[in-house]
């Protein structure tokens, strides 16, 4: 459960991220594909090379979904309901991949905004990413 302080921390971090959705999203995906190669299996039709237009476009969607969750931080489940349906029913993405993606996103945030990612903010952002992952996997059950 996100506390009021967690929500404030997450919203503050995302003020730094919003203008970089495509770049940070692409970097997150590239990092995930490199660090966890089995995650590539869900993207057989993508050009997975650095700078790929497909990676940039999907990265922008990923960060866009996170921004949507931040904008509706008191109702993440409602905000991401359609995305949850898509991943559970059509794409059937292994739920562990959301955790891996979240870890890679944290690294990207740390690289680009090291002074913002204090231990307290890191904990808040991690809790938020876990909450998003839980919403995206809730309909698997």
Swiss-Prot record:
Family stated for the protein in its record: Belongs to the globin family.
InterPro entries named among the record's database cross-references: Globin, Globin-like_sf, Globin/Proto, Hemoglobin_a-typ, Hemoglobin_oxygen_transport, Hemoglobin_pi
UniProt GO molecular function: haptoglobin binding; heme binding; iron ion binding; organic acid binding; oxygen binding; oxygen carrier activity; peroxidase activity
Descriptive protein name: Hemoglobin subunit alpha-A/A'
UniProt: O2 binding residues: 58
Quaternary structure and partners: Heterotetramer of two alpha chains and two beta chains.
Gene3D superfamilies: Globins
Keyword Magnesium on entry: no
Ranges of residues in domain Globin: 1-141
Gene for this chain: HBAA
One Pfam family this sequence matches: Globin
Keywords on record: Heme, Iron, Metal-binding, Oxygen transport, Transport
GO biological process: hydrogen peroxide catabolic process
SUPFAM superfamilies, A to Z: Globin-like
Tissue: Red blood cells.
CC per GO annotation: blood microparticle; haptoglobin-hemoglobin complex; hemoglobin complex
Purpose: Involved in oxygen transport from the lung to the various peripheral tissues.
Residues that bind heme b: 87
